[in-house]
A protein has these predicted regions:
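Ser/Thr/Asn(+Pro)-rich, low-complexity disordered segments
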Residues: 1-233
């Protein structure tokens, strides 16, 4: 069962990738019918997960190391040219052009959470290839530059001790979504603290994510005991 799950997961991201970018499609219709004409829309965060699935596929022998490297080179070449906003990627792009596909009316810029999901996948690729042959090392260095380009501090909205989910070149900070814990966004705070070029101070984690200890808030939801506060509850 585990072998089947791993292989099928790999195949979704390998065979189902958007042809130009090599990235994960936002949606896949088995009948090939796309009423919204969005077959070429790709997702940044989902691609971060897909990249790690491809690494597992290489290790499992589903494709050769050389085939995997070629796919990663295509992905990184796309990301180097695709729309970015202070180093952060949007939630969606058009895979054939690299231009942002708005996720919503005012969500046409950087999405720091989806960027974090993508960067964690890229960093896994970096570590996989950094001690390899010359082509592999070259790819790892290109990934390192993408990682270094993300301006996590910009997404503090004027230096606040919290990270904001969105910024738009058209609407600025109008989405107005500061991120507090606990939720799926913890990797964003970890990467922001670890950045070698735009690292945020510890207070951003303690005030923004952990809310100076208020993140610990034992309560029950439908009889299930939870120990951490979930943003929005």
């Amino acid at each position: 069962l585990m072998d089947t799950v791993q292989r099928r997961t790999f195949l979704y991201f390998w065979e189902g990738a958007e042809p130009n970018s090599g990235l994960a499609p936002e949606r896949y219709h088995v009948d090939g019918v796309y009423p919204q004409n969005d077959a070429n829309v790709v997702t940044s965060g989902g691609s971060g997960f897909g990249i790690m699935a491809i690494l597992a596929g290489i290790d499992r022998g589903y494709v050769t190391r050389e085939e995997g490297l070629a796919r990663m080179e295509r992905i990184v070449s796309f990301l180097e040219k695709a729309d970015r906003f202070h180093g952060a990627y949007p939630h969606w792009w058009y895979g054939d052009t690299g231009k942002v596909k708005p996720f919503g009316q005012k969500d046409n810029g950087g999405d720091l959470v989806e960027t974090a999901f993508l960067i964690q996948g890229l960093l896994a690729v970096h570590q996989y290839y950094i001690n390899g042959n010359e082509k592999e090392k070259a790819l790892a260095q290109r990934i390192d530059q993408i990682w270094r380009d993300v301006d996590w501090n910009w997404y503090r909205k004027g230096g606040q001790n919290v990270l904001y989910w969105h910024w738009s070149p058209t609407y600025g900070w109008e989405m107005d979504f500061p991120i507090h814990g606990y939720n799926e966004c913890m990797i964003m705070y970890i990467l922001a603290a670890a950045s070698p070029t735009h690292g945020v101070p510890a207070a951003v984690y303690h005030d923004g994510w952990a809310q100076n200890g208020a993140i610990v808030s034992p309560h029950k939801v439908e009889g299930i005991e939870l120990h951490l506060r979930y943003q929005g509850t």
